[in-house]
């Protein structure tokens, strides 16, 4: 199985616990974080939106500060600004990667994570259900 996935750093940290039978080729955050402006859509922020108020304001202020640091880094190339960006970056920042895994790993992930409290796992498991030969993953019809 090979697929492109865009998800937040929290989800990727959990995905990376599956090391055997997987490969991940990511777009490097370290080399590209300063290229484009920070926008709310670069982040998973559904929970922040649901809570609203000061939480939403804090998120938007963080984006403003990240953008200020990005501009300073691009202007000066001083790595202290780049380092501050990496340290301040919320874990909701979305990263894109191509993953390759076998059906055995997908089956393990599916059964361990299909009812997970992170919505991203539920979405991922739904994508696995749509794959050819998904019954090898879901084990539906097997006794």
Identify the function of each model-found stretch:
Residues 1-143:
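Family-specific signature for flavin-dependent thymidylate synthase
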